[in-house]
């Protein structure tokens, strides 16, 4: 019986743009960094959990820095040069994630805070007593 001859196909990179948007979602438990092009297609992403941190260490500023560097290096290798940064959430890793994006070699054009603020929506969780 004749065997099929397989052609080796490689995944073709989409036309990567030079400009992009860095979305940083920083919660108290984790930090997620997603880098997209202008139309919103994801180019690279990383989180504190995907960078090797587990448990309570995912919420630390160092974990956010590591995740941002990992996503930034991946996007830089695909040809991205300048980005605008959108930050959402009030976690401890937002400032260090922004600094590591700038330090990775991106030209940051703008930084915006898009944290959602409720207009008296859901009841917030009760205060912690330690």
Swiss-Prot record:
GO BP annotations listed: translation
Q: Which InterPro entries match?
A: Ribosomal_uS11, Ribosomal_uS11_bac-type, Ribosomal_uS11_CS, Ribosomal_uS11_sf
List the record's Gene Ontology CC terms alphabetically: chloroplast; ribonucleoprotein complex; ribosome
Query: Could you tell me the keywords of this UniProt record?
Result: Chloroplast, Plastid, Ribonucleoprotein, Ribosomal protein, RNA-binding, rRNA-binding
Extract the SUPFAM superfamilies matched here. Answer: Translational machinery components
Disulfide bond residue pairs: none
- Annotated localization: Plastid, Chloroplast
Q: Which GO terms describe its molecular function?
A: rRNA binding; structural constituent of ribosome
Which family is annotated? Belongs to the universal ribosomal protein uS11 family.
> Quaternary structure?
Part of the 30S ribosomal subunit.
* Name listed for the protein in its UniProt record: Small ribosomal subunit protein uS11c
